């Protein structure tokens, strides 16, 4: 299962994903490529694969990304190899921007798309300023982009409002657990159980409607 967590810059999606990974087994993080320089304690291959613009564009031209976009002047993308490799060990969670999420929906219609929202606009502004990573002009650009992205929230499968980190992380965990219990994702397990009852074949579970 592919789980896409997206939302405006500063909404807290990266922090939420880290907490969810600590609370759930069988969940791998898809590491994106980017041309932006590392920030603070970021490590190559952990938060991102940091590459030159030349290398990124060569990869894009070769069709090696399942999604990529220009975000605040830098290139970001998810390689098909990364998604494939991480998917072998279970479910994969992606931390990508709204443009990338739309691309994933087109290529993988079964993906679960979750939009993380700040409680109010003022809180988002406060978080961006509190990071002390960008100047006023960059923050203003991020906030303007956030206004546009928020208007698209209705296109996503789930919305998590990050007004309280603990509650929001539990909401995200609940979404993933619920998706894992869908009958189409339980078919293999159900078939095995049916065999123990002396039955075989596909489970006869009626579809709605």
Question: What do the predicted segments below correspond to?
Answer:
Residues 22-30:
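Post-Walker A helix-loop "phosphate-sensing" segment adjacent to the P-loop in P-loop NTPases
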Residues 93-97, 106-130, 161-162:
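Conserved phosphate-donor/acceptor-positioning beta-strand/loop module used by diverse small-molecule
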Residues 2-4:
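Short hydrophobic/aromatic beta-strand immediately N-terminal to the Walker A/P-loop
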Residues 133-134, 151-209:
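NTP-dependent small-molecule kinase module
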Residues 13:
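Conserved lysine of the Walker
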Residues 16-17:
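Post-Walker A alpha-helix
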Residues 34-92, 99-102:
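ATP-dependent small-molecule kinase phosphotransfer cores
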Residues 6-8:
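P-loop (Walker A) phosphate-binding loop of NTP-binding proteins
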């Amino acid at each position: 299962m592919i789980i896409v967590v997206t939302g405006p810059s500063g909404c807290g999606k990266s922090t939420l994903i880290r907490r969810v990974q600590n609370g759930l087994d069988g969940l791998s993080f898809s590491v994106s490529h980017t041309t932006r320089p590392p920030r603070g304690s970021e490590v190559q291959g952990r938060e991102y694969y940091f590459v030159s613009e030349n290398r990124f564009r060569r990869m894009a031209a070769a069709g090696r990304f399942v999604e990529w976009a220009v975000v605040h002047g830098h290139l970001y993308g998810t390689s098909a190899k990364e998604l494939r490799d991480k998917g072998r060990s279970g479910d994969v969670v992606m931390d990508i921007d709204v443009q990338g999420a739309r691309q994933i929906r087109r290529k993988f219609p079964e993906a679960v798309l979750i939009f993380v929202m700040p409680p109010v606009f003022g809180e988002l502004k406060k978080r961006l300023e509190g990071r002390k990573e960008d100047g006023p002009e960059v923050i203003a650009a991020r906030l303007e982009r956030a206004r546009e992205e928020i208007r698209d929230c209705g296109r996503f499968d789930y919305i998590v409002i990050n007004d309280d980190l603990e509650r929001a992380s539990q909401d995200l965990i609940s979404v993933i657990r619920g998706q894992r219990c869908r009958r189409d994702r339980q078919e293999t397990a159900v078939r095995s159980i049916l065999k123990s009852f002396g039955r075989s074949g596909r489970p006869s579970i009626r579809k709605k409607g």
